[in-house]
Each structure stands twice: as structure tokens, then as C-alpha cells.
Amino acid sequence: GKAKYVFYFIGDGMGVNQVNAAETYLGALQGRIGIEPLCFPSFPYSAFVNTQSATNGVTDSAAGGTALACGQKTKNGTLGMLKDLTTSITSIADWARNSGAAVGITTSVAIDHATPAAFYAHVKERHEQYTIGKQLVESGNDFYAGSDFTIPTDPEYPNGPTLYEEAKAKGFTIAR
């Protein structure tokens, strides 16, 4: 059958050591030796991934996010494109939306940060925040929740509409 809901949780930069440290700390808060388990390690499905980028032994959030979102490695700093910096690649969010599913992306950081942006953006450089925000508005996804756009105004047209205004015009409800 077809899944009714799919949730894809990413602990950006988080590994086994960070989870163990948090669980050990929670156990210590209760005055005991040992761990107090976090809830997510008991989810019915989980995976650990090793995400070297296409060009570096240590990935960054853009290349790592792209690998997680698109299943393809790219160079550090790049979102939603192959390392040739010309070929855009589709993400799991695109696949879901094109299959008729509603797609929402939530984050605890700026909505145009590299990890969430890997699911909707296609840019050569992760620091192209205005372009990333523009692609969010045009993505066709249904829902976004996060901390703000990093650069909401077009640097070339500072008196033009903001990304908030453009998102609202596309039917998004803006809560700030």
C-alpha cells in the first residue's frame, strides 16, 4: 500500500557520539549512572549514513543535505546539483510532490539554510540565500516552517517585493 505519512528526520552533524552524550546527560540529571533514552532511536525505521562529498573526505551541510535529499554526491557548498555545477538533480521532495503527495519542510534553522534547502534548491553555492529563497517560493511544496529567510530582499532590487511578499502571493500563510 501507499504510505499515508512519511517523516524524514535529519540530525545535521549528529552522530552516535552526540546521541550517547545526550542520553548519558539525561540519565545523570535523574541522578543515576546510565542513559535515559531519547525517543527517536526507538523509531521503527532508522539509518546511519556516511556522507563524504564528491570532492572532500569531510562533507558540509550543502553536500551532505544533497546526498540525503537527492541520493547523489556533490561538491561541498553545492545544493541540488551534481559536482559539474550545471546538472540539477531531483530530490525526494520532488518525487513525493510529483506522485501527488503534499510536501512540507520544517527546520530549527533558517529555512534557506543548506540542509532544508537541499530538498528544493539548485544552486552552485550555498551562500546564494536570496536565490535559494526564491526557489523555495517557486518550489510547489505545500508547507515550510523555519526561522526566517536569511536575505529576504533581492540585493539587485532592494525596493522590490520581499520573499515574504512573493510567498504570500503564491498562497503561503506567513506567520512571523
What are the functions of these language-model segments?
Residues G1-R176:
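N-terminal catalytic scaffold of extracellular/periplasmic and nuclease hydrolases
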